[in-house]
Amino acid sequence: MTDDASHADDSRPDAGVARRRVLQAGAAAGAALTWGAATGTAHAAEEARAAGSASAHPAPCRPGAPGSASWFSAPPAPVRPKFRWWWPDGLVEPAEIRREIDQIADAGFGGVEIAAVHHSVDDPAVLDTARHGWGSASWVAGMEAALEQADRRGLTVDLTAGPAWPTAVPTITPDSPAAVQELAYGVAALAAGARYEGPVPAPVVAADPAAAKATLLAVQAVRVDTANSTRKETGLDPATLVDLTRTVTNGAVTWTAPDDGGSWLLFAHWLRGTGQTPEAGPHTAPTAYVVDHFSPAGTRAITDFWESDLLTRPVRRLIARAGGALFEDSIELESRALLWTPALPAEFARRRGYDLLPYLPALLLNKSNQVYAYGAALTVRVRHDFWQTVSELYNTHHVTAIKKWASTFGLKLRAQPYGLQTDAIATAALLDIPEGESLGFKNLDDYRCLAGGRDMAGSTILSCESGAYTGGAYSTTWQKFLRTMGGAYAAGVNQTVIHGFSYAALPGVAWPGYAAFTPYHGGVGYGESWGPRHPTWRHIADMSGYLARVHQVLQAGKPRQDVAIFRQTGYTATGIGASWFTSTGIPLGWNHQFISEPLLSLPSARVTNGVLAAGGPAYRALFVEADFFAGSTCTLPVEVAEKFLAFTKAGLPIVLLGDWSTATVPGLDTGGQDARLRAVLAQLLAQPRVRQITDKTAVGAALADLGVTPLVSYATSSTLLNAHRYADGVDYFYFCNGKHAETVKPPVAAVDHEVTLRRGSTRHVPYLLDLWTGRVRRIGTYTENGDTVTLRVALQPGETMVVALGVPGLFGDRTGSGPHAVSTTADTVLFADGRLTVRGSADGEYVTELSQGRRTVRSRISGVPQPTQLTGWRLDVEDWQPGATATETRVVRRALTLDALAAWPDIPALADVSGIGRYRTTVRLGRAWTGGHGALLDLGTVYDTCRVTVNGHRLDPVDHINPVVDLGGWLRQGDNTIEVEVATTLGNRLRVSDPGVYGGSPRQPYGLVGPVRLLPYWEARIG
């Protein structure tokens, strides 16, 4: 940005802020800023430099060895966060695609995921799908440009399998065998003795207009049994079912109901296409229809289209160099009836051992609602078997087949394996990269389900579609993003795909450019369109650096977990947690993951030295409870119970909650399985390493009785979350003072208590890894007790930290195994320049006990200045306003003098301003300010992102959750200039520049709100 405007000289008091005097020094038009449209100018050089050099280590580089300083401080591109990159189908220009790749690379990100999404486009005429649709020549040209530029910049490109979601191709119709299908039903009611003669009943729910074909699968009659009715379902008697399919002639059936005094229903079951198209289409010409996700034909339709239309020779060559993963969004298959695939009856009989068709009435759906039921237990069992079969077909014919195909040209498969009643835990184990989402997941246990599948399979990455908020367009703050994601990382997430980055321009869009999800039906949309259009992009490399370091730690080595929770039904995105562990165990330091039956057939499912999957998550106990998704009944497959028996005989502790004496298999008992199960369970419960309890409050005591304690334990119950990884002899512990769900009551409060960590060797010492700055230092105060280390953790809500336990000398540390403090009355004891140092913020004598010989050292500190609240600020504002085009920003410069800090909406001149503000003040320090003196700068409340400069020196990135900065040695005797640069969202400006969409949004309290305090400290060497 350049400032070619002159500043006015007028100054006047503004009475709009009570108890504050705001002097407006000037306001004038500034330079125009454009960031992306191929028809516009390049992003201003000043902003490009700001994004490219924003953090201490912003750019991807060659990875250092694990345990080295550079390994943590400067993670390489493959570890760095990615953007979901939304294109308006193929209406893109290769030059603009290359420019946006550069913007993302310069900002310190490691990759993109290309998706054809345009929910904000209400007028389909804007997009000529014949010329610019997904899969068109222009789409392929965009792919080639993205891959080519990504290769140059060291990024990876993920490719979505179809336009928007779910996966669809334009080479099929709803009547094609490869299209997603449903089983619809027609029904006629008959009284006892009544005769039906005529066409078989037509479906009660009309087909999609595009689905012209319907095939009759079966015709059945069954008597109503009100004893089996529920509040929403009509009860039926399965023993009375009559199969009339063979009696159908020319589409008609004749049948007389028994004259038994009952009411009868005549069902016709019709197989037809759902006609589902991908979200917010059309995206192609001809129209793309969603494929059958449960058959080889559906998968073949995907692979055939890619092979013929997308995988050109240049694309194949570039994928080999810059390709990342093929991506599929959540399984949002929509049906007015029951999802189906033609081979389902035969596959069901082969896999479950009995005929599915007699049980169809208990499976039928009408607009997602169950309509009929047999007896409660029978209905639950049959529905379990149905969805288990569907899950297996999805995993076999869709996930496994696509994964194998994608690998042939160099792509992994990343997918969100939820949305149906299928075993997402099992699917997560099959995928190269399973993915969850912050918008759709109810709480952290949803991530723990996918993490269990990932870790039992021996994979590394659990990805997350991150930071989408309903109504959050152009008002999403990075602080909110960080608070959301902090807990997800503790639950197993270690790859962030940010939602998202929109292509710059589209005809007819308003400033600040094309955004995939806003406006949404005329209102504020969801998700954010990050990029240079945002003022906070100036600080974006601080965010990418932080996220990259989180990933680096949480992708290191192997996970370490405490307990595996067995799930009979492997759903996720449900918010259903684990008894005791979710509510009580996690707040005490325990960690758990969920596993399901298919995971027990993996090579990792072995017990070694009493540990399950010792080479992976290393579960030290197994917990089994009733199936929440089957009416909280105690169910287990016989084969699973037998494996549990083998596990505990090999030494694995197992705790079972509930009455298992009457346990049943989850599916239909077709031959004495219930009796076999109970016999195996009787043996299991008699084992010495097994405990059965009936009260969930007794879980902790049962584990203690078995000698199982958490690897991380807290001195008190708290909101502290943790994740543990082990790599190359080093234990990494990630901590977050986080929330179990996005909205929790009461809100998370600050924590400050002792935490005890298990270490691999008594030689290991603790290091603090600063996720914001990339710096590492040995921790100065802790106690040791054999294989444990105890230290104090104090975190504000949402704040994070990483502790590593390893041999002396890691990360370039020079303190070796020298003595440390075990206790102190000072504010803190730290290693500074290799020497043990006590720090105090008030005059007095401080007593520190050292580890070596338990020696006590007294340190006297005097002359510490009092904390000072900083006032008298000059504020220079870049006011970002709509420019001449949708992608051009007009910058208006404003200069103000503030006697006291206030949020921008409370300053009349800034009430509707978005942009960047630079706050400057001067602090005079006396002659006593010499060696050993320093200060913390507590910024108080800042909205949204910020950076701090002292005497012209830009400091390390600020912790945006707890913005307290150590000014270290940058202060000097005399005058010191402190500058705080703050960047905002665009929400406040859009309220007035585009009121039809954003006018109802509340103003956000931008700026440096404070109070800003200088907190002096004195240091003294004690080592």
Model-derived features: positions:
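C-terminal segment of N-terminal export signals and the immediately downstream linker at the start
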Residues: A15, A37-R62
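Short acidic/polar inter-strand loop motif in beta-rich domains
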Residues: R854-T856, A983-L990
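Short strand-edge motifs at loop-to-beta-strand transitions and within beta-strands
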Residues: V789-L791, Y919-T921, P963-V965
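N-terminal export leaders
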Residues: R19-Q24
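Carbohydrate-binding surfaces of carbohydrate-active enzymes
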Residues: V79, E93, R98, W134-W165, ...
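Aromatic-lined ligand-binding clefts that engage carbohydrates, nucleic acids, or primary amines
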Residues: V923-N951, I978-E981
